Amino acid sequence: GGKSMGRRAMYHSTMFEDMGFHYFGPIDGHDEAELERALRAICSQPGPHFLHVVTKKGKGYAPAEANPGNFHGVSTFDLAHSIPDPEVAPKESFSTVFGNLLNKQGSENEKICAITAAMKYGTGLQFFYHTHPKRFFDVGMAEQHAVTFAAGLASQGMLPVVCIYSTFLQRSYDQIIHDVNLLKENVVFAIDRAGFVPADGETHQGIYDPAFLSQVGMPIYSPS
């Protein structure tokens, strides 16, 4: 009835319940007592369950709450002042150099636009974003859409630069072939974390892009 519809509209549970899940939540994921109560209650009931837990990135540390992108992956640092440890503080990275250069070129050429998949800071695009916000597009964790979107922009005369980590570019291989390569669209792929990436762990090793991109005849350039 109306009560059930109201509950579903409020908690967005319809999709999960339509799939046969019992929906619970949303609850505060930072409240350990509440979270434990919910988990114990769910475990005592039969059937599949969906627990909706709401959290905030960086919760409890003001600098991270204010700027979560800068705290996506960090080394040791002075917690009181949010200053990196001098012994592990990174030198100017490839991503920073690239980001500053693209930002400069964006000021010289209004056709240039930047696209990323939830990696604005990781690919150095924060500079372009602040200077050219109307030509910056973060599509979220949707690499396939990022590539197809870039092909669409290129077809209309724009010069899209797609900035994605090598290991995540693999997800969009079908779109690279069909939407960019076969249609001969002018899209630039700025591939971050290419090659061996010790600091980012096993999942972020960019060791396949030379093989799968050269297979479809895409020119590959690497800074010396």
Question: Which residues make up each language-model segment?
Answer:
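Active-site cavity-forming subdomains of large catalytic enzyme subunits
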Residues: 1
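Thiamine diphosphate
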Residues: 7-13, 21-38, 43-224
